[in-house]
Amino acid sequence: MPALLKRLLFQVGPHPNERTFTLSSVSTDGHYISLRPFVKPSGDELSFPFEWAFAGTNETVKVNDQGNGVVTQDFNFWLDTNVYLNVPNTHRGEVNTTWKNWDSGCVEETGAVYPFGADKESVSFRELWQPVDPSREDLVIVSPNNEKFSSNARSIVLKVTDEAYDGLVIVIGRWIQGFLSQKNNNTIEGLNFIRLLXKDSGKSEFLLSYGKEVNKIPQSYENLKKGSTVTSNGLNWEVIEYHA
């Protein structure tokens, strides 16, 4: 079942906060992307207005159901903007997380990273997520009474890997998120992101568009099938998942 989650809270240390409009998309087959743009970027943030962004296929995450509403997820991100940009004091390697369902329908994520090295002191973090209905234009919460939610929302994933680019687009219902990165660039000039919302009118609205090559990311997702190829401004994308 596909999922769309909005982050409500981020906490490192004693003071929780939320400065971003973070949405994470998870496809039916387990591919994922999380875009975390600042709501009110300032100063140096204006040139790259993201707290973080990451993405990966289902081959880059290990999911284990622990029972009683607890799931562990261990990530080896395909794209990690902090790693891509060589940000100082960045965790490298697998990130281990634990997800716990709350009675309210929210999901608590906890974990730890090692920004100073695997043999150094860890930094714990906590995030709170609200599942939302991907078939709706508005951010309508899912299962407020902890009822099981079954979604018929479409789940489509496109991927590009060639000598020059990596990229992933995930369509969950009406909500589309994607990235495209230039290989061997490792600057903000090599990063591109989109967030689109398909409207009742049949048109798509850009909620986020970042990067000089964003037009190489597909923005139409009709008449596709698994294994087919979509070309966007000369760049070929493979449809690796199609449930619609």
Swiss-Prot record:
Residues with PTM Phosphoserine: 143
Primary location class: cytoplasm
GO cellular component, one term: nucleus
InterPro entries: Hri1 (IPR031818), Hri1_N (IPR038744), Hri1_N_sf (IPR043047)
Keywords: Cytoplasm, Nucleus, Phosphoprotein
Compartments where found: Cytoplasm; Nucleus
Keyword Nucleus: yes
Matches recorded under Pfam families: HRI1
Subunit structure, as described in the record: Interacts with HRR25. May interact with SEC72.
Family: Belongs to the HRI1 family.
Designated name of the protein: Protein HRI1
Source species: Saccharomyces cerevisiae (strain Zymaflore VL3)
